[in-house]
Every structure is written in structure tokens, then in C-alpha cells.
Amino acid sequence: MGQKVSPNVLRLGIVRDWENRWYAEKDQYVKWLDQDIKIRTALFKLLKDAAVSKIDIERTTKDLTLFIKTARPAIVLGQEGKNIEKIVLAVRKTVKNKKLIVNVRVIEIKSPDADATLVARWIGEQISNRASFRTVQKLAIKKALKAGAKGIKTAVSGRLGGVEMARTEGYLEGSVPLSTLRNNIDYALYEAPTTYGQIGVKVWINHGEVFKKERMNNSQIMAKPRTNKGGKR
């Protein structure tokens, strides 16, 4: 069953936390969920050069807090916090509320080579630039294991090398037990555009076992976040 379900979803409440953390009544739930999707889309576009892996959102009726997980915190913060102001304005524009209190917490990724989202994105970008799909997968695996990953699995699907028949090729190094729920498996999917069509890239990275029943939130697995409120440092 571990092969059929997203490892991220399968581990919610065990070793992973939800990306959206708030409570809303029925009439408000759909509105906030739609806003969260639009906020992430806008911010990933705004911060496309900042190597952003994940954006978590916490809400109350009066304020909204963003947890931006990135390998380049300096780019997200900007000179004298100018990019934070842009992020706050983008969020307020998306939710159509100029008075909303927006808090931004930037969390630095210590090992970007062991982050599934960044690894999948890097493999996809290299394939889009006509690099060998076999070479980039092997290089990504080597870097991930060197960065401390217990195991990594990669797979690319589509018209690989421009051939007529679509196929899937991948590699596995180390241990990646998808059905062991106490294993913190990081999973990501990326679609790489090429002249022959879309190439799907999947990455699974095993960060080891978590024996205590605790949610892996940002404060537990990352360094102390940097906080900015209302667009000011």
C-alpha cells in the first residue's frame, strides 16, 4: 500500500504535520483553503530564485503566519527586509484584505541536497536543459547520501531522451521503507517541460526513524526561524 499512497499524506499526524494549520466553520473553510492555494502559487512565483521547498500557513481570524522553508534565506528576506514587504503585500492582495496582519518566518534548510522538493526540482531543471536523465539522477543520489540521507529513490517518466515510447527509469540507494510509518520519508513530484513533452520526476528521501510519537513541525526539525511582522524587520 505504501507504493500507492503519497508518503507525505500517509505520515500525517505521525512524523509529519499539516501544511495548513487552522480551524474554520463550513462557510469559511472553502474560502480559506482556496486562498491558501492561491497564496502558495503567488509566493512560489515571487520567490522562484530563492530555492523555496515548502510554505506552511497558520491562521486565526485576525492574522496569518507564513513559514517559508528555503535554502536561500537571504534572498527571501532581501536587503533590509524589502522582500518581506513584497510577500506581505502579495498575501494581502491575494486574500483581498489590506488590514490583515501577516507574519513571515523564514526557516533555513541546512541540507538542501537532502530535501526531496529541491532535489526533484534540480533533476527536472537539468533534464529541461538537455542533461542526461541517468547522470543527473546518479549525481543527485550521491549528493543526498553525502548530506546525511539514510536512503533515496528517484524515478523519471515520459519520453526520455526523446524516444517515441514513454517509459520510467529510476534508481534506489540505501533504505527507503515506504510502509514503515515511523520512518520520516520526504516525497516530492516535479514536472519538467521539454521539447518532447512533460517529464515527471519523483524523489523519495529517507531521513531515518522517529520513535517518539511527535509531529515533525518546523521548530523541531529546523533552526530557530527569523520572524518579521507586517513587512517590517
Swiss-Prot record:
Keywords: Ribonucleoprotein, Ribosomal protein, RNA-binding, rRNA-binding. It comes from the Bacteria. GO terms for biological process: translation. Residues 39-108 form the KH type-2 domain. InterPro entries: KH_dom, KH_dom-like_a/b, KH_dom_type_2, KH_sf_prok-type, Ribosomal_S3_C_sf, Ribosomal_uS3_bac-typ, Ribosomal_uS3_C, Ribosomal_uS3_CS. GO terms for cellular component: cytosolic small ribosomal subunit. One of its GO terms (molecular function) is structural constituent of ribosome. Gene3D superfamilies: 3.30.300.20, Ribosomal protein S3, C-terminal domain. CDD domains: KH-II_30S_S3 (cd02412). Pfam families: KH_2 (PF07650), Ribosomal_S3_C (PF00189). Binds the lower part of the 30S subunit head. Binds mRNA in the 70S ribosome, positioning it for translation. PANTHER family: 30S/40S RIBOSOMAL PROTEIN S3, SMALL RIBOSOMAL SUBUNIT PROTEIN US3C. Belongs to the universal ribosomal protein uS3 family. Part of the 30S ribosomal subunit. Forms a tight complex with proteins S10 and S14. This is Small ribosomal subunit protein uS3. It comes from Mycoplasma capricolum subsp. capricolum (strain California kid / ATCC 27343 / NCTC 10154).
